[in-house]
């Protein structure tokens, strides 16, 4: 039985609860929605808006992020300019070409380390890196090291060193892994028995903010070499390593910016790496915008698959790389296949799988995710056209969940397929 005193206390308590302020909370930023929820569209649309508004820094970030979504028109074409009509192309009359994968395998037979570079806005470079990684495994290459794998941080973070086949793969292992093409390379490497090594510089290896650009480069390159040695060569001096790095890091000889990763690695360890340039050799989205050296190669050889090109026994490349790498890979201009990039369809392990798409509103991504991993980085995804009812996924064998990401967020999965 309630007494007056009990009723009074209850009223006080209820009143107190009623006026208690809610805990402070703030909406997630577009970047947080990407990093925490795995949503790509908010960050993509925000970067597009910033670039359209003329924010200088947004363009570079947009190009890299657009590559994650398969938007090559933005990632590659955003900064393209036509060559001058009177631009002179390099003389290729004495140039020679070979199939790129065959040449790399042959050259790597007696090498301990292979270093391949990429441009961070070209997903196709990651597709080619996947095929190189696959081809090197039968030669005994056992370690996959990439610039994007995160080193230990001040705060607790996942480590790629512990990643094993079938584990959920998420962008906490490294920023560029958010590109599904990159993520599939890592998954396949685990399936093939590779171990993984991170070597990027740590927060405690960075010079003061007042350091010059060249000092920043020198500190980073030296730290990368030290870290690769500590992570791999110290404990496994005979390990055979495939390294995927950003553009300039693959230079084996001094050039603009000084001594880069490959050159410092060779000097410190005495190991002569096989260095491969592809970062500046990708076709533009329009032939008239091809760089002169790319236009010359495509005109001379008309390749249908990646090739390595040399002149007088020297790898042919632009002025930053010619004479500073062992091999230079050029990629063909390929037609799209089932609405998807030709380079993606050219991977012999991927199969074009046409799926029906539920109705949606506004911008949307069609995504296929590995069934056993849960809701992490897709195995494949691409931006849909308004009203698109069917689309082709490019998938390796396995079981997948299909879903859409729209402006509202991640929609419930709508289907399962087995390839």
Language-model features: locations:
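N-terminal export signals
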Residues: 6-24
């Amino acid at each position: 039985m309630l007494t007056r005193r009990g009723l009074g206390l209850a009223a006080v308590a209820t009143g107190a609860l009623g006026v208690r302020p809610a805990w402070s909370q703030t909406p997630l930023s577009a970047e947080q929605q990407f990093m925490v929820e795995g949503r790509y569209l908010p960050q993509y649309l925000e970067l597009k808006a910033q670039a359209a508004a003329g924010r200088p820094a947004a363009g570079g970030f947009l190009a890299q992020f657009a590559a994650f979504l398969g938007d090559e028109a933005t990632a590659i074409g955003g900064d393209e300019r036509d060559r001058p009509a009177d631009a002179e192309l390099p003389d290729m009359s004495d140039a020679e070409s070979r199939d790129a994968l065959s040449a790399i395998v042959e050259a790597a037979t007696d090498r301990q380390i292979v270093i391949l570079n990429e441009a961070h806005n070209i997903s196709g470079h990651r597709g080619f890196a996947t095929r190189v990684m696959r081809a090197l495994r039968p030669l005994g290459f056992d370690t996959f090291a990439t610039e994007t794998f995160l080193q230990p941080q001040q705060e607790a973070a996942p480590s790629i060193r512990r990643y094993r086949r079938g584990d959920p793969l998420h962008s906490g292992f490294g920023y560029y892994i958010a590109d599904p093409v990159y993520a599939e390379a890592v998954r396949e490497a685990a399936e093939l028995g590779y171990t993984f090594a991170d070597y990027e510089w740590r927060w405690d290896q960075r010079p003061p903010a007042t350091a010059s650009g060249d000092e920043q480069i020198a500190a980073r390159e030296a730290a990368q070499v030290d870290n690769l040695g500590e992570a791999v060569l110290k404990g496994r001096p005979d390990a055979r390593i495939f390294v995927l790095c950003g553009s300039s890091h693959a230079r084996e000889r001094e050039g603009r910016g000084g001594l880069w990763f490959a050159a410092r690695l060779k000097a410190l360890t005495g190991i002569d790496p096989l260095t491969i340039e592809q970062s500046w050799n990708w076709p533009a989205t329009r032939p008239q915008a091809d760089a002169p050296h790319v236009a010359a190669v495509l005109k001379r050889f008309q390749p249908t698959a990646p090739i390595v090109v040399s002149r007088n026994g020297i790898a042919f490349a632009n002025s930053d790389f010619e004479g500073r790498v062992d091999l230079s890979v050029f990629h063909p201009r390929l037609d799209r296949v089932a609405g998807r990039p030709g380079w993606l369809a050219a991977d012999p392990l991927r199969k074009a799988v046409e799926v029906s798409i539920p109705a949606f509103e506004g911008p949307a991504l069609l995504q296929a995710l590995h069934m056993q991993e849960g809701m992490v980085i897709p195995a494949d995804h691409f931006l849909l056209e308004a009203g698109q009812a069917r689309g082709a996924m490019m998938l390796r064998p396995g079981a997948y969940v299909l879903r859409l990401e729209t402006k509202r967020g991640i929609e419930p999965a709508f289907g399962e397929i087995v390839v």
